[in-house]
Curated annotation (Swiss-Prot):
Species of origin: Mycoplasma pneumoniae (strain ATCC 29342 / M129 / Subtype 1) (Mycoplasmoides pneumoniae)
High-level lineage: Bacteria, Bacillati, Mycoplasmatota, Mycoplasmoidales, Mycoplasmoidaceae
Annotated protein name in UniProt: Segregation and condensation protein B
Gene: scpB
UniProt cross-references to NCBIfam families, sorted A to Z: SMC-Scp complex subunit ScpB
Gene3D superfamilies, sorted: Winged helix-like DNA-binding domain superfamily/Winged helix DNA-binding domain (1.10.10.10)
Function as written in the Swiss-Prot or TrEMBL entry: Participates in chromosomal partition during cell division. May act via the formation of a condensin-like complex containing Smc and ScpA that pull DNA away from mid-cell into both cell halves.
Subunit structure: Homodimer. Homodimerization may be required to stabilize the binding of ScpA to the Smc head domains. Component of a cohesin-like complex composed of ScpA, ScpB and the Smc homodimer, in which ScpA and ScpB bind to the head domain of Smc. The presence of the three proteins is required for the association of the complex with DNA.
HAMAP family to which the protein is assigned, alphabetical: ScpB
GO cellular component: cytoplasm
Cytoplasm among keywords: yes
Length: 208
């Protein structure tokens, strides 16, 4: 007679209704999503039958938990429409030491200039951009569209019916802000620094 005892592993049931499990699930999902992060809509698609209100409440709970935990170097930050896990500013010096070369702005100075013009004047057309710059911006606008940093809103009802542009959610992610209100005020705006990417670095890593 075969005396082998077959051990059956218990089946763990998912408890979508459990607030603790929901917080843990969101934490894990944000972790694996990396720099891309996740929007509420994406979380809602993955966490089926949970509902947006419960997801929002769990996000707030997780955000508060990480924020108040002095032993955690991670927090949740919203970039445009996406939520991401990022390192806290309190440990930025250690991060800099580990990664001595900061992530550099992937945009050149002319592209930064056009992007700044659109951000501060949106909705904005190519003729308006050219007028402000005093130079043609056709190729740069196309590059920004290709990089998905701006989007077309349609055409303006003026002669020539030029396209209208505004910044995209990816713009907010790149500069580490939630809204245009977080951009430097116009009276304090330094276009040269914006061109050089200083604004990009300061918002990603804090002032040195």
């Amino acid at each position: 007679m075969d005396a082998t005892i077959k051990v059956t592993k218990p089946v763990l049931k998912q408890k979508d209704s459990s607030a603790a499990n929901l917080v843990a699930a969101i934490y894990g999902l944000l972790f694996v999503s990396g720099e891309k992060g996740l929007t509420l809509a994406e979380l809602n698609r993955v966490l089926r039958k949970v509902g947006l209100e419960k997801i929002k409440a769990a996000l707030v709970q997780l955000e508060r938990k990480l924020s108040l935990d002095d032993e955690s170097g991670i927090e949740i930050k919203k970039f445009g429409h996406s939520f991401r896990l990022v390192t806290k500013m309190e440990i930025k010096d250690f991060i800099h030491r580990y990664l001595p070369n900061k992530i550099k702005n992937p945009l050149n100075s002319k592209t930064m200039e056009v992007l700044a013009i659109i951000a501060y004047n949106q909705p904005c057309t190519r003729p308006r951009i050219n007028e402000i710059r005093g130079a043609d911006s056709f190729q740069i606008v196309d590059d920004l569209l290709e990089k998905e940093l701006i989007v077309e809103l349609g055409r303006k009802d003026t002669p020539g019916r030029p396209f209208i542009y505004e910044v995209s959610p990816k713009f907010y992610d790149l500069f580490g802000i939630n809204s245009l209100d977080e951009l430097p005020k116009v009276e304090n705006f330094d276009l040269d620094k914006f061109r050089q990417g200083s604004f990009f670095d300061s918002n990603r890593y804090g002032d040195d």
